[in-house]
Amino acid sequence: LRLASWNVNSLKVRLPQVLDWLESAKIDALVMQETKTTDDVFPQAAFAEAGFDVFFLGQKTYNGVALCSRQTTVKTSDVVLGLPGWPDPQKRFISALLSPLAAPEQPPIRFCGGYFPNGQAVGSSKYLYKLDWIAVLERTLKTYLADTPRLVLGGDFNIAPADADVSNPEAWRGKILCSEPERKALERLFALGLYDSFRLFTQPAERFSWWDYRQSGFERNHGLRIDL
């Protein structure tokens, strides 16, 4: 199966690009972050017309996650909306079991999508919420892995795993997205048996997923790799 993750930054704006890319890249299942749409107006019909089942958990203006799977290649079951056992008004997590229709004898994959909190600033209440959120996610993944060893977690992690994922490491040292507690929390997720799939292969230097548009970051390639 070809699995992918995309911070769409408003599905209302990005829907044509998402549908085009799902087809051109032959994606079997996709987790989306920052859909920024409430469930009552989610474009479910557009995904169905394109041949996808879609599941979603949204809110107005902020956050929101979704998971879609291709009907001809994937059987989707046991959809979970939100982090189990942790009521949170912010809609940030979704997961489901995926079974490839071409190989029904294979065990299913637990496909998870997360929109990690940004944290705003080191030491702030939003930063503490971020660390708490990741701790709950860690417990959730432990439970999942006990039942389903084949697990994929994708999303906007809002953490640069290492200095190699930052265009100017010294400028970001100790700051939000790069602070030591954030990276340690991410390392604990890897310690569960997960791998950063991007780093399993030789990559060119300075490959990032986020740039600050206010400082012409994209044009200058001054960015961070915070989407895993």
Language-model features and meaning:
Residues 81-84, 116-134, 170-174:
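Surface-exposed cleft-lining segments at the edges of enzyme active sites
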Residues 20-22, 92-105, 136-149:
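Short amphipathic alpha-helices and their capping/turn segments at secondary-structure boundaries
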Residues 1-10, 108-123, 154:
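Active-site-proximal beta-strand elements of phosphoester/diester hydrolases
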Residues 1-49, 62-65:
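N-terminal, active-site-proximal structural segment of metallo-dependent hydrolase catalytic domains
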